[in-house]
Each structure stands twice: as C-alpha cells, then as structure tokens.
Amino acid sequence: MKGDIIISPLSTEKTALMAEKENKLTLMVRRDANREMIKKEVEERFGVKVEGINVMITKKGKKAIVKLAKEYSAEEIAERIGVF
C-alpha cells in the first residue's frame, strides 16, 4: 500500500471540543486503512502514544477518532498541524 494513511485532519466545533475535553484527534483516513496502520502512522508522524482508535465509514470517507495518551495534548498536536 503506497502513500499516506492519513488524508487530512477534520476540523469542526465537535472535533475541537473532543480535542480539548477528551484528548482526541479526528482524522480522515484512507478507506483501506485498519486500526493498526492508523496507530502506527499517527505515532510516527506526530511523535505521540495512541491509547485507542474508533473508526467509522461515512459518506465522505473513513474517519478515525484517535485517543492520545495522557502525557500528550491533542490540542497541541492539532495546532501544530494547522487544525485550529
């Protein structure tokens, strides 16, 4: 499988609240990506530890909600990648 797993970060009011209160990032990912691929990509690209991943397929594509370990800040990562 060639190319990046992560297509883009998702930026809405709800995702901003999730980043702030629940320490979660919301990302659009390739449709053929699985949880292990997403976890590896997030940990390597952003230098964080992932606690869990929820994945859902929507009309707009595959969405991954990634819960980060307590020692990392989802808000800080989101600011660094230009979501907020």
From Swiss-Prot:
InterPro entries: Nucleotide-bd_a/b_plait_sf, Ribosomal_uL23, Ribosomal_uL23-like, Ribosomal_uL23/eL15/eS24_sf, Ribosomal_uL23_CS. Pfam families: Ribosomal_L23. It comes from the Archaea. GO terms for cellular component: ribonucleoprotein complex; ribosome. GO terms for molecular function: rRNA binding; structural constituent of ribosome. Keywords: Ribonucleoprotein, Ribosomal protein, RNA-binding, rRNA-binding. HAMAP family: Ribosomal_uL23_A. Binds to 23S rRNA. One of the proteins that surrounds the polypeptide exit tunnel on the outside of the ribosome. Belongs to the universal ribosomal protein uL23 family. This is Large ribosomal subunit protein uL23. The gene is rpl23.
